[in-house]
Amino acid sequence: MGKRILVQRRGRGGSQFRSPSWKRDGPVRYLPLEATSGRGYVVELLHEPGLNAPVARIVTESGAEFFNYAAEGLYVGQVIEMGSGATPKAGNIMILGEIPEGTMIFNVEKRAGDGGKYARSSGTYAVVVGQKPEENKTIIRLPSGRVIEVDARGRATVGIVAGGGRIEKPFLKAGKKYHRARAKAWKYPTVRGKAMSPYAHPHGGGSHQKGGTPVPKTAPPGQKVGFIGSRCTGRGCVRARAQQKQ
């Protein structure tokens, strides 16, 4: 009797495949709109295992507490200005409609009050391109270069997310990569299907390794692995598609 392949077991969602949420300090998001005003204080800088950037724990004057990504140069004890009237200084949380053009920002809200959706990875930032006060819209350029409009009543943090250059440092050891993957419940290492036994994968088995064949789109679950209904595969296929576009 065959077994369910690994992707089916992952899809079912067993405990060994779930991200360890009990290790998290808390969600990185702004307080509700009515609570984000006045001043806050950076109490602690934390390493969050499930995130790619340092996290700052901020306590407001009213005693409310929340987590936000740390800006480059942020330090413990720094005073954070929040809400309307805040100055464009690194680490301050401002209303998008009040941020000057050309300012670098991160953790940008798509809609007012959603807690932050854009530019949240280490070393990234968005740039304020312009304002549309008559439409309550702010034009920003994302790290990808895409230009979008967001709600001008939303919030963003001034500066660049700390931890830039993270991907430039090599892992050096497979063990470090293992622990990074384990913190996020990633599948590591990735084993090729044709290197497995026949009971574990449709491409497995044989006296020597052979490449798998494309699978029809009508194949049942468990058999549908590898390339699904592909017209061609390999480097030549990519080259041919590039020539067609030209």
Curated annotation (Swiss-Prot):
Gene3D superfamilies: 2.30.30.30, Nucleic acid-binding proteins, Ribosomal protein L2, domain 3. InterPro entries: NA-bd_OB-fold (IPR012340), Rib_uL2_dom2 (IPR014722), Ribosomal_uL2 (IPR002171), Ribosomal_uL2_arc_euk (IPR023672), Ribosomal_uL2_C (IPR022669), Ribosomal_uL2_dom3 (IPR014726), Ribosomal_uL2_RNA-bd_dom (IPR022666), Translation_prot_SH3-like_sf (IPR008991). Transmembrane segments: none annotated. Residues 196-226 are annotated as: Disordered. The keyword Ubl conjugation does not apply. One of its GO terms (biological process) is cytoplasmic translation. One of the primary rRNA binding proteins. Required for association of the 30S and 50S subunits to form the 70S ribosome, for tRNA binding and peptide bond formation. It has been suggested to have peptidyltransferase activity; this is somewhat controversial. Makes several contacts with the 16S rRNA in the 70S ribosome. NCBIfam families: PRK09612.1 (NF007180). This is Large ribosomal subunit protein uL2. It comes from Pyrobaculum arsenaticum (strain DSM 13514 / JCM 11321 / PZ6). The gene is rpl2.
